[in-house]
Amino acid sequence: MAHGLLAADTHHFSEVPAFDQSEENRHNSVKRMDIRKAVITAAGKSQRQLPLQSLVDRDGQTKSALAIIIEEVISAGIESIAVVISPGDSAAFRAAAGPHAQRLTFIEQTQPLGYAHAVHCAAEFTGGDAFLLLVGDHLYLSHTGQGCAAQLVALARAEKCAISAVQSTHESQLAYYGAVGGKLVDAIRRLYQVDTVLEKPTPTEAEQKIDVPGLRAGYYLCFFGMHVLTPAVHRVLAAMFKENAGRETSVHLRAALAQLAESERYVAAELDGRRYDFGVKYGLLTAQLALALAGKDRDEVLRGMVELLATARGK
């Protein structure tokens, strides 16, 4: 096993994990941005089975969605990967990971306290390091020879700050994604300085609160399901969970990112690629079609689609 890789094991977190880091280490971690760890969240009630579904990849090989996501992560130079899962799911996820299972650490989110809590469950795993964060119910398809995760990691290393991938998204889809507003600071690399973060806004709220010059009318920069975050996010989350203890309201990652934008440089980037969300209606089908049309069997798939369209009959 290569140096730095973690054997497949399972950790359990029911309480909000403590997070402590010296000022010196915090400064050095951001200065280096040596991103070697990744966290994949897959513990949500509606999310937990989606990474286990089978797809045919661009090479025509059948594998789980999880395996495809892990390959995306590995291509970005990541050495250690944690997957946040629901209790009892480790065996299924280990099997779905196939030959990549030895790279994984499984972290059980024993209480269903939401996405932000799932991310914070990995605080001990990420420690004082910046890390790549992905959701387990998205597929990422690059339009270049460099994977989406590799693009984002390269940008984070160059910018030495937290960075979220975003995608121009029509307002009809805002109910599914967080959205950001900000100033375009690098047109060539499509980098934005984030000043506003909203959690699944309505079109009216987005129009009133988000300003992104240059986007088409009715379109907003929505999260891609992929971030590189600094250790500061865990300090912010720890404080938010402490303040929220005993209350019925939830802690959202969106709020933590908004605080992050106030305390350190935080940017967003449009990548050369697209996200495909398994969690929406026909999402898995759309992801499979995208893979097929970008792969070696494209012509065969197109012929099948033409035949299907020619013979399909609606009610």
Enumerate the predicted regions with their spans.
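Leucine-biased recognition of intrinsically disordered, low-complexity hydrophobic segments
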Residues: L5-L6
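Conserved N-terminal catalytic core of the sugar/cofactor nucleotidyltransferase
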Residues: E23-Q47, S54-L133, L139-T144
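Phosphate- and divalent-cation-binding pockets in alpha/beta enzyme and binding domains
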Residues: R48, A92-F93, V236, A256
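Residue-level signal for inorganic ion chemistry
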Residues: L66, A122, D137, V180, ...
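Conserved core of the sugar-phosphate nucleotidyltransferase
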Residues: S142-H227, P231, R235
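Conserved alpha/beta core of the MobA/IspD/sugar-nucleotide pyrophosphorylase nucleotidyltransferase superfamily
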Residues: A206-K315
